């Protein structure tokens, strides 16, 4: 068998394929938090910090034949675009001890690691921290008990956070992580996943506003590792925690942490604002459920919104999830533009085993 017939080595890194890789990287990044810090102005000098500013390790573990030499680093792209910025690695992706645990070789950087540069950061400075897992820490045969960032990166982040609160954190990862501390001390957080060959350019263009983020989470980001596994479609129980019984101890709840994730499935921010209105649900003559709504861009820049349609089974003969995603549609809108969105759902799609 040859499932990739027609794809030769000469066609892998063409300009067309690079453009597609750039588009996919940009659209898959998820803006998790933004306290009016992003997008950054290119006229303002910014410090880019963290081991991923100088690393080509942006591919996924599943990219077995991926060519790291073809990946540009964030520092490379900043220089190519002539963006005024200072790049400091600060630490390695993994410590020497962590490299032994994960059976990888240390990726040595020729960048100086003198910590005196930290003393030059003032409370007015903006720092973009590019942090994350090593690519060996996700994918097959990479189970983890703790989902925090590697230790040296945590230390680096805390030292930066002691100097300034104007922090944008870009997270490179192949799985959900425990990002609570990062989120608490960052004014903006971008989940970049493992963005691939053109990931560095996509991240930079997103930070500076050339790309308006439109990605949504395909997983839930836990409030802490104790919530794992956590899913938006967790099944109902006989003692569901609701807004009406928050003081009732005898509900399905954690006593010391929230029940809800830090960032839920389907979540993702934009640099513009959207409004979904005029929602209608009706049964068509062919027995399909028709869901209609209008979505409008109420902000000042063009953007894309992913309209998501969920349903809940109120009564069933077996335990059903709290809610289930049944349809979604990505809608591109200019400022002030409004569009109709229609979903048609067959009745069979509401069926389940055991009925």
Regions from the language model: what does each represent?
Residues 1-62, 66-74, 79-81, 95-101, ...:
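Secreted, periplasmic, or luminal enzymes acting at the cell surface/secretory milieu
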Residues 302-309, 320-321, 353-355:
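Short, hydrophobic/aromatic beta-strand segments
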Residues 57-60, 131-151:
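Glycine/threonine-rich flexible loop motifs
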Residues 124:
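An anion/phosphate-binding loop that grips the pyrophosphate of nucleotide cofactors and donors
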Residues 317-353:
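Intrinsically disordered, low-complexity Pro/Gly/Ser/Thr-rich segments with frequent PxxP/GP/PP motifs
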Residues 76-117:
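Conserved SGNH/GDSL esterase-like catalytic core that processes O-acyl groups on lipids
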């Amino acid at each position: 068998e040859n499932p990739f017939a027609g794809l030769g080595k000469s066609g892998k890194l063409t300009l067309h394929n690079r453009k597609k890789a750039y588009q996919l990287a940009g659209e898959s990044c998820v803006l998790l938090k933004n306290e009016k810090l992003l997008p950054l102005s290119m006229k303002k000098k910014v410090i880019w910090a963290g081991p991923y500013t100088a690393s080509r390790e942006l591919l996924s573990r599943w990219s077995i034949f991926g060519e790291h030499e073809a990946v540009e680093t964030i520092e490379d792209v900043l220089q190519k675009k002539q963006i005024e910025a200072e790049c400091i690695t600060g630490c390695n992706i993994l410590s020497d001890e962590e490299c032994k645990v994960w059976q990888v070789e240390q990726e040595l950087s020729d960048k100086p690691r003198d910590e005196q540069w930290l003393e030059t950061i003032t409370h007015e400075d903006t720092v973009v921290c590019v942090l994350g897992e090593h690519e060996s820490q996700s994918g097959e045969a990479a189970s983890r008990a703790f989902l925090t960032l590697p230790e040296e990166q945590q230390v680096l982040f805390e030292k930066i956070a002691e100097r300034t609160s104007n922090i944008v954190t870009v997270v490179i990862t192949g799985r959900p992580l425990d990002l609570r501390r990062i989120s608490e001390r960052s004014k903006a957080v971008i989940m970049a996943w493992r963005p691939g060959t053109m990931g560095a350019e996509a991240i930079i263009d997103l930070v500076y506003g050339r790309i308006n983020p439109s990605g949504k989470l395909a997983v839930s980001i836990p409030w802490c590792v104790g919530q794992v596994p956590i899913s938006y479609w967790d099944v109902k129980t006989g003692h569901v925690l609701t807004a009406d019984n928050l003081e009732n101890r005898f509900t399905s709840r954690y006593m010391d942490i929230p029940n809800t994730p830090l960032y839920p499935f389907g979540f993702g921010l934009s640099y513009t604002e959207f409004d979904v209105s005029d929602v209608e649900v009706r049964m068509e003559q062919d027995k399909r459920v028709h869901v209609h709504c209008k979505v409008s861009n109420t902000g000042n820049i063009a953007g894309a919104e992913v309209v998501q349609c969920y349903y809940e089974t109120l009564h069933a003969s077996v335990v059903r999830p709290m809610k289930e995603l049944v349809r979604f549609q990505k809608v591109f809108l200019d400022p002030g533009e409004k569009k109709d969105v229609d979903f048609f759902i067959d009745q069979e799609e509401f069926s389940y085993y055991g009925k």
